[in-house]
């Protein structure tokens, strides 16, 4: 532990093309082996595909997709008296964003299209329309929280 007090979170710089911090986080999560240029190319190509297929502003589609994927509730295991309970909790805003990005990328990587840019574009368009694996993951998480509402009084 540091002796000089709390070290704050590092703030990411907004991406150069759309001036969005959330998009930078998506690009950073998409990146493998430090190849940020490649991750940016994939992301911007995906945005071009969205622009061509929907005719809408890609940033609007991305924001809509994020809103549809970010979870409000999640369950966390809590051990009480030898039994483990799944306790529903509200998700902090930062974690909501992180989970949304993570689920979109996982769902995109599992898709069948040939190129990652097409997969990402497809998943973002599906998520914007409340379809796709990422939205399904959010619904599952909410269902789990709803099913375990009886244990809400065990909150942290």
From Swiss-Prot:
NCBIfam families listed in its UniProt record: rpsG_bact
Function description: One of the primary rRNA binding proteins, it binds directly to 16S rRNA where it nucleates assembly of the head domain of the 30S subunit. Is located at the subunit interface close to the decoding center, probably blocks exit of the E-site tRNA.
Highest taxon listed in the record's lineage: Bacteria
SUPFAM superfamilies per record: Ribosomal protein S7
Name of the protein this chain belongs to: Small ribosomal subunit protein uS7
Encoding gene (name): rpsG
Biological process terms in GO annotation: translation
Annotated GO MF terms: rRNA binding; structural constituent of ribosome; tRNA binding
């Amino acid at each position: 532990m540091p002796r000089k007090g709390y070290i704050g979170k590092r703030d990411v710089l907004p991406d150069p093309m759309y001036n969005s911090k959330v998009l930078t986080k998506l690009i950073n999560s998409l990146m493998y082996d430090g190849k940020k240029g490649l991750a940016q190319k994939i992301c911007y190509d995906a945005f071009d595909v969205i622009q061509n297929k929907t005719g809408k502003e890609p940033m609007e589609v991305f924001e809509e997709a994020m809103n549809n994927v970010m979870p409000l509730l999640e369950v966390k295991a809590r051990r009480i008296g030898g039994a483990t309970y799944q306790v529903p909790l509200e998700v902090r805003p930062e974690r909501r964003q992180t989970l949304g990005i993570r689920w979109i990328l996982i769902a995109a990587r599992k898709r069948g299209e040939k190129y990652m840019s097409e997969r990402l574009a497809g998943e973002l368009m599906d998520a914007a329309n409340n379809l796709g694996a990422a939205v399904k993951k959010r619904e599952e998480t909410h269902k789990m929280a709803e099913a375990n509402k009886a244990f809400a009084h065990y909150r942290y």
